[in-house]
Design a protein with these regions (language model features):
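Acidic, Ser/Thr-rich peripheral helices and adjacent loops at domain boundaries
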Residues: 106-109, 212-225, 257-267
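Anion-binding and metal-coordination hotspots
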Residues: 4-8, 33-36, 107-109
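Conserved SAM/AdoMet-binding glycine-rich loop
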Residues: 45-193, 201
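Short acidic (Asp/Glu) and glycine-rich catalytic loops that position anionic groups and cofactors
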Residues: 20-27, 51-56, 82, 116-119, ...
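Iron-sulfur (Fe-S) cluster-binding segments and ferredoxin-like electron-carrier domains
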Residues: 25-42
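N-terminal pre-triad scaffold of radical SAM enzymes
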Residues: 2-24, 198-200
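Flexible glycine/acidic-rich beta-alpha junction loops that bind and position SAM and/or redox cofactors
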Residues: 21, 68-70, 97-98, 120-125, ...
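Radical SAM enzyme core and accessory elements
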Residues: 222, 231-309
Length: 309
Protein backbone atom coordinates (compact mmCIF):
# COMPACT_ATOMS: atom_id res chain seq x y z
CA UNK A 1 0.00 0.00 0.00
CA UNK A 2 1.27 3.44 -0.92
CA UNK A 3 -0.21 6.89 -1.61
CA UNK A 4 2.19 7.34 -4.54
CA UNK A 5 0.35 5.33 -7.18
CA UNK A 6 -2.63 5.78 -9.49
CA UNK A 7 -4.72 3.59 -7.15
CA UNK A 8 -3.50 5.21 -3.96
CA UNK A 9 -3.85 3.25 -0.71
CA UNK A 10 -6.01 0.60 -2.35
CA UNK A 11 -5.40 -3.07 -1.57
CA UNK A 12 -5.12 -4.87 -4.92
CA UNK A 13 -5.63 -8.63 -4.76
CA UNK A 14 -5.14 -10.94 -7.72
CA UNK A 15 -7.88 -13.57 -7.53
CA UNK A 16 -7.19 -15.33 -10.83
CA UNK A 17 -4.95 -15.21 -13.88
CA UNK A 18 -5.99 -16.02 -17.42
CA UNK A 19 -9.43 -16.41 -18.97
CA UNK A 20 -11.61 -19.25 -20.20
CA UNK A 21 -13.33 -17.22 -22.93
CA UNK A 22 -10.44 -17.00 -25.42
CA UNK A 23 -11.64 -13.90 -27.27
CA UNK A 24 -9.43 -13.80 -30.37
CA UNK A 25 -8.12 -10.28 -29.79
CA UNK A 26 -7.15 -10.79 -26.13
CA UNK A 27 -3.49 -11.27 -25.26
CA UNK A 28 -4.19 -12.31 -21.66
CA UNK A 29 -6.39 -15.24 -22.64
CA UNK A 30 -3.68 -16.85 -24.77
CA UNK A 31 -0.51 -15.76 -22.97
CA UNK A 32 -1.77 -16.70 -19.50
CA UNK A 33 -3.38 -20.05 -20.29
CA UNK A 34 -4.21 -22.26 -18.50
CA UNK A 35 -6.34 -20.25 -16.10
CA UNK A 36 -5.26 -20.13 -12.45
CA UNK A 37 -7.73 -19.32 -9.67
CA UNK A 38 -6.75 -18.67 -6.06
CA UNK A 39 -8.89 -20.00 -3.18
CA UNK A 40 -11.30 -17.66 -1.43
CA UNK A 41 -9.79 -18.50 1.96
CA UNK A 42 -6.35 -17.24 0.87
CA UNK A 43 -7.81 -14.09 -0.68
CA UNK A 44 -9.81 -13.23 2.44
CA UNK A 45 -6.80 -13.94 4.69
CA UNK A 46 -4.83 -11.28 2.80
CA UNK A 47 -7.76 -8.89 3.10
CA UNK A 48 -8.10 -9.40 6.87
CA UNK A 49 -4.40 -8.75 7.42
CA UNK A 50 -4.54 -5.52 5.41
CA UNK A 51 -7.86 -4.23 6.78
CA UNK A 52 -6.30 -2.09 9.57
CA UNK A 53 -4.42 -0.19 6.85
CA UNK A 54 -7.18 0.54 4.33
CA UNK A 55 -10.88 0.06 3.63
CA UNK A 56 -10.47 0.10 -0.16
CA UNK A 57 -9.77 -2.98 -2.26
CA UNK A 58 -9.70 -3.92 -5.92
CA UNK A 59 -9.89 -7.42 -7.33
CA UNK A 60 -7.47 -8.18 -10.16
CA UNK A 61 -8.45 -10.73 -12.79
CA UNK A 62 -9.14 -10.93 -16.49
CA UNK A 63 -12.64 -12.16 -15.68
CA UNK A 64 -13.38 -11.43 -12.01
CA UNK A 65 -16.78 -13.09 -11.88
CA UNK A 66 -15.54 -16.31 -13.49
CA UNK A 67 -13.99 -17.21 -10.15
CA UNK A 68 -16.00 -20.18 -8.78
CA UNK A 69 -16.06 -18.60 -5.29
CA UNK A 70 -16.71 -15.01 -6.32
CA UNK A 71 -19.88 -14.65 -4.23
CA UNK A 72 -18.03 -15.87 -1.12
CA UNK A 73 -15.14 -13.49 -1.86
CA UNK A 74 -17.43 -10.47 -2.30
CA UNK A 75 -19.49 -11.38 0.77
CA UNK A 76 -16.34 -11.81 2.88
CA UNK A 77 -14.91 -8.48 1.77
CA UNK A 78 -18.25 -6.82 2.47
CA UNK A 79 -18.29 -8.27 6.00
CA UNK A 80 -14.83 -6.78 6.52
CA UNK A 81 -16.35 -3.44 5.46
CA UNK A 82 -14.17 -3.02 2.41
CA UNK A 83 -15.29 -0.82 -0.44
CA UNK A 84 -14.88 -3.17 -3.40
CA UNK A 85 -13.89 -2.02 -6.88
CA UNK A 86 -14.35 -4.23 -9.94
CA UNK A 87 -12.88 -3.02 -13.24
CA UNK A 88 -15.58 -4.80 -15.22
CA UNK A 89 -17.87 -7.82 -15.05
CA UNK A 90 -18.19 -10.52 -17.69
CA UNK A 91 -21.66 -10.22 -19.15
CA UNK A 92 -22.80 -13.82 -18.70
CA UNK A 93 -21.57 -13.78 -15.07
CA UNK A 94 -23.86 -10.92 -14.01
CA UNK A 95 -26.25 -12.27 -11.38
CA UNK A 96 -28.50 -10.63 -8.79
CA UNK A 97 -26.52 -11.79 -5.68
CA UNK A 98 -23.31 -10.19 -6.98
CA UNK A 99 -25.09 -6.97 -7.94
CA UNK A 100 -26.81 -6.80 -4.55
CA UNK A 101 -23.52 -7.08 -2.65
CA UNK A 102 -22.03 -4.25 -4.72
CA UNK A 103 -25.16 -2.10 -4.50
CA UNK A 104 -25.35 -2.57 -0.72
CA UNK A 105 -21.99 -0.84 -0.31
CA UNK A 106 -23.11 2.08 -2.45
CA UNK A 107 -21.76 1.07 -5.84
CA UNK A 108 -23.85 2.55 -8.66
CA UNK A 109 -21.61 2.13 -11.72
CA UNK A 110 -20.68 -1.02 -13.60
CA UNK A 111 -18.67 -1.80 -16.73
CA UNK A 112 -19.17 -4.61 -19.24
CA UNK A 113 -17.53 -5.45 -22.58
CA UNK A 114 -19.85 -6.43 -25.44
CA UNK A 115 -16.96 -5.42 -27.79
CA UNK A 116 -19.14 -5.35 -30.93
CA UNK A 117 -22.61 -4.15 -31.88
CA UNK A 118 -24.03 -7.41 -33.20
CA UNK A 119 -23.87 -11.17 -32.77
CA UNK A 120 -22.14 -11.87 -36.10
CA UNK A 121 -19.05 -9.88 -35.24
CA UNK A 122 -19.04 -11.12 -31.65
CA UNK A 123 -19.04 -14.70 -32.93
CA UNK A 124 -16.13 -13.88 -35.23
CA UNK A 125 -14.03 -12.61 -32.31
CA UNK A 126 -15.28 -15.51 -30.14
CA UNK A 127 -17.26 -13.27 -27.78
CA UNK A 128 -20.09 -15.51 -26.59
CA UNK A 129 -22.76 -12.88 -25.93
CA UNK A 130 -26.12 -12.75 -27.70
CA UNK A 131 -28.15 -9.58 -28.12
CA UNK A 132 -30.86 -11.09 -25.90
CA UNK A 133 -28.35 -11.85 -23.13
CA UNK A 134 -26.96 -8.33 -23.34
CA UNK A 135 -30.42 -6.81 -22.95
CA UNK A 136 -31.38 -9.15 -20.10
CA UNK A 137 -28.20 -8.48 -18.14
CA UNK A 138 -28.48 -4.72 -18.65
CA UNK A 139 -32.04 -4.85 -17.33
CA UNK A 140 -30.82 -6.79 -14.28
CA UNK A 141 -28.07 -4.22 -13.63
CA UNK A 142 -30.45 -1.25 -13.66
CA UNK A 143 -33.13 -3.13 -11.72
CA UNK A 144 -30.64 -3.65 -8.89
CA UNK A 145 -30.00 0.02 -8.27
CA UNK A 146 -27.16 0.80 -10.69
CA UNK A 147 -27.43 4.07 -12.56
CA UNK A 148 -24.38 4.01 -14.84
CA UNK A 149 -23.39 1.23 -17.23
CA UNK A 150 -20.17 1.52 -19.21
CA UNK A 151 -19.88 -0.46 -22.44
CA UNK A 152 -16.45 -1.33 -23.81
CA UNK A 153 -16.65 -1.56 -27.62
CA UNK A 154 -14.22 -1.69 -30.54
CA UNK A 155 -14.04 -0.43 -34.11
CA UNK A 156 -11.66 -1.70 -36.77
CA UNK A 157 -12.10 -5.38 -35.88
CA UNK A 158 -11.31 -7.97 -38.58
CA UNK A 159 -14.25 -8.44 -41.03
CA UNK A 160 -15.98 -5.30 -39.69
CA UNK A 161 -18.39 -3.57 -42.09
CA UNK A 162 -20.11 -0.19 -42.00
CA UNK A 163 -23.26 -2.03 -40.93
CA UNK A 164 -21.41 -3.43 -37.92
CA UNK A 165 -20.50 0.11 -36.86
CA UNK A 166 -24.11 1.24 -37.27
CA UNK A 167 -25.15 -1.72 -35.12
CA UNK A 168 -23.14 -0.24 -32.25
CA UNK A 169 -25.54 2.69 -32.34
CA UNK A 170 -28.57 0.41 -32.52
CA UNK A 171 -27.36 -1.72 -29.61
CA UNK A 172 -26.69 1.30 -27.41
CA UNK A 173 -30.10 2.72 -28.33
CA UNK A 174 -31.78 -0.54 -27.27
CA UNK A 175 -29.94 -0.56 -23.95
CA UNK A 176 -30.76 3.11 -23.47
CA UNK A 177 -34.47 2.30 -23.60
CA UNK A 178 -33.95 -0.33 -20.91
CA UNK A 179 -31.97 2.12 -18.77
CA UNK A 180 -34.66 4.79 -19.06
CA UNK A 181 -37.50 2.36 -18.31
CA UNK A 182 -35.81 0.83 -15.26
CA UNK A 183 -34.64 4.21 -14.02
CA UNK A 184 -38.09 5.75 -14.38
CA UNK A 185 -39.68 2.85 -12.48
CA UNK A 186 -37.29 3.44 -9.57
CA UNK A 187 -37.28 7.23 -9.74
CA UNK A 188 -33.65 7.39 -10.87
CA UNK A 189 -31.80 8.80 -13.88
CA UNK A 190 -29.73 6.11 -15.58
CA UNK A 191 -26.87 6.61 -18.02
CA UNK A 192 -25.00 4.55 -20.62
CA UNK A 193 -21.35 5.23 -21.41
CA UNK A 194 -20.22 3.63 -24.68
CA UNK A 195 -16.41 3.65 -24.56
CA UNK A 196 -15.13 2.87 -28.04
CA UNK A 197 -11.52 1.88 -28.69
CA UNK A 198 -9.70 0.86 -31.85
CA UNK A 199 -8.87 -2.81 -32.31
CA UNK A 200 -5.14 -3.24 -31.61
CA UNK A 201 -3.65 -6.50 -32.99
CA UNK A 202 -1.55 -8.20 -30.31
CA UNK A 203 1.25 -10.77 -30.52
CA UNK A 204 0.50 -14.32 -29.37
CA UNK A 205 -3.18 -14.05 -30.38
CA UNK A 206 -5.01 -15.42 -33.44
CA UNK A 207 -5.07 -11.85 -34.76
CA UNK A 208 -1.34 -11.18 -34.45
CA UNK A 209 -0.95 -10.96 -38.25
CA UNK A 210 -3.74 -8.40 -38.60
CA UNK A 211 -3.01 -4.71 -39.14
CA UNK A 212 -4.42 -1.63 -37.51
CA UNK A 213 -7.20 -0.05 -39.54
CA UNK A 214 -6.17 3.11 -41.37
CA UNK A 215 -6.21 6.37 -39.46
CA UNK A 216 -8.76 7.74 -41.93
CA UNK A 217 -11.09 4.79 -41.37
CA UNK A 218 -10.83 5.00 -37.58
CA UNK A 219 -11.42 8.75 -37.59
CA UNK A 220 -14.52 8.34 -39.78
CA UNK A 221 -16.00 5.61 -37.59
CA UNK A 222 -15.34 7.40 -34.32
CA UNK A 223 -16.68 10.68 -35.72
CA UNK A 224 -19.81 8.89 -36.94
CA UNK A 225 -20.41 7.38 -33.50
CA UNK A 226 -19.82 10.69 -31.77
CA UNK A 227 -22.40 12.40 -34.01
CA UNK A 228 -24.95 9.67 -33.43
CA UNK A 229 -24.54 9.60 -29.66
CA UNK A 230 -24.53 13.38 -29.27
CA UNK A 231 -28.22 13.32 -30.08
CA UNK A 232 -29.07 10.65 -27.50
CA UNK A 233 -30.07 11.68 -24.02
CA UNK A 234 -28.70 9.58 -21.15
CA UNK A 235 -25.70 8.56 -23.29
CA UNK A 236 -22.13 9.82 -22.75
CA UNK A 237 -19.80 8.76 -25.57
CA UNK A 238 -16.09 8.18 -24.98
CA UNK A 239 -13.84 7.63 -28.00
CA UNK A 240 -10.20 6.63 -28.22
CA UNK A 241 -7.70 9.02 -29.75
CA UNK A 242 -6.58 7.71 -33.14
CA UNK A 243 -3.03 8.82 -32.36
CA UNK A 244 -3.14 6.75 -29.19
CA UNK A 245 -4.33 3.75 -31.23
CA UNK A 246 -1.42 4.10 -33.66
CA UNK A 247 1.06 4.34 -30.78
CA UNK A 248 -0.39 1.29 -29.01
CA UNK A 249 -0.29 -0.73 -32.23
CA UNK A 250 3.33 0.28 -32.78
CA UNK A 251 4.30 -0.75 -29.25
CA UNK A 252 2.54 -4.08 -29.75
CA UNK A 253 4.23 -5.03 -33.04
CA UNK A 254 7.54 -3.15 -33.24
CA UNK A 255 10.96 -4.82 -33.26
CA UNK A 256 14.35 -3.78 -31.89
CA UNK A 257 14.86 -1.18 -34.62
CA UNK A 258 12.38 1.02 -32.77
CA UNK A 259 14.55 1.27 -29.65
CA UNK A 260 15.51 4.87 -30.38
CA UNK A 261 11.84 5.88 -30.56
CA UNK A 262 11.18 4.22 -27.20
CA UNK A 263 14.19 5.99 -25.69
CA UNK A 264 12.83 9.32 -26.86
CA UNK A 265 9.43 8.53 -25.35
CA UNK A 266 11.08 7.51 -22.06
CA UNK A 267 13.02 10.77 -21.99
CA UNK A 268 9.79 12.76 -22.14
CA UNK A 269 9.32 13.50 -25.84
CA UNK A 270 5.53 13.76 -26.40
CA UNK A 271 3.99 10.83 -28.26
CA UNK A 272 2.25 13.22 -30.66
CA UNK A 273 5.64 14.56 -31.72
CA UNK A 274 7.08 11.07 -32.13
CA UNK A 275 4.14 10.02 -34.31
CA UNK A 276 4.80 13.00 -36.56
CA UNK A 277 8.60 12.79 -36.73
CA UNK A 278 8.70 9.01 -37.28
CA UNK A 279 5.50 8.72 -39.27
CA UNK A 280 6.86 6.51 -42.07
CA UNK A 281 8.69 4.12 -39.74
CA UNK A 282 5.64 3.71 -37.54
CA UNK A 283 3.34 3.37 -40.55
CA UNK A 284 5.44 0.49 -41.86
CA UNK A 285 4.55 -1.46 -38.72
CA UNK A 286 0.89 -0.62 -38.20
CA UNK A 287 -0.67 0.18 -41.61
CA UNK A 288 -3.23 -2.18 -43.21
CA UNK A 289 -0.91 -2.88 -46.15
CA UNK A 290 1.85 -4.01 -43.79
CA UNK A 291 1.37 -7.37 -42.09
CA UNK A 292 3.60 -9.27 -39.70
CA UNK A 293 7.00 -9.60 -41.47
CA UNK A 294 6.90 -13.34 -40.82
CA UNK A 295 3.78 -13.64 -42.96
CA UNK A 296 5.53 -11.97 -45.91
CA UNK A 297 9.20 -12.84 -45.82
CA UNK A 298 9.37 -15.92 -43.64
CA UNK A 299 11.48 -14.02 -41.13
CA UNK A 300 10.68 -14.70 -37.47
CA UNK A 301 8.23 -12.29 -35.88
CA UNK A 302 9.82 -9.81 -33.44
CA UNK A 303 8.14 -11.60 -30.55
CA UNK A 304 8.80 -15.19 -31.67
CA UNK A 305 11.54 -15.71 -29.07
CA UNK A 306 9.21 -14.89 -26.16
CA UNK A 307 7.80 -17.88 -24.31
CA UNK A 308 4.20 -17.66 -23.13
CA UNK A 309 4.83 -20.11 -20.31
Amino acid sequence: LTPRTELADKLLIEISRGCTEMCRFCWAAYAMAPIKQYPAASILKIAREARPLTDRTGLIATAVCDHPEIEAILAGLSELEFHIALSSIKIDAIEAPILQILAKQGERALAIAPEAGNERLRRHINKKVSDAMLRDKARLVFANGFTRLKLYLQVGLPTETDEDVRDIVRTVADLREIAIAEGRAAGRVAQLVPSVNAFIPKPHTPYEDESLASEESLKEKLAFLQREFEGMGNVAFRGMSVGEAVWEAYLAKMDETGADILEQAASGVPVRRLLKEHRERIAAVVRPSCVNPAAVSGAPAPWSFISKR
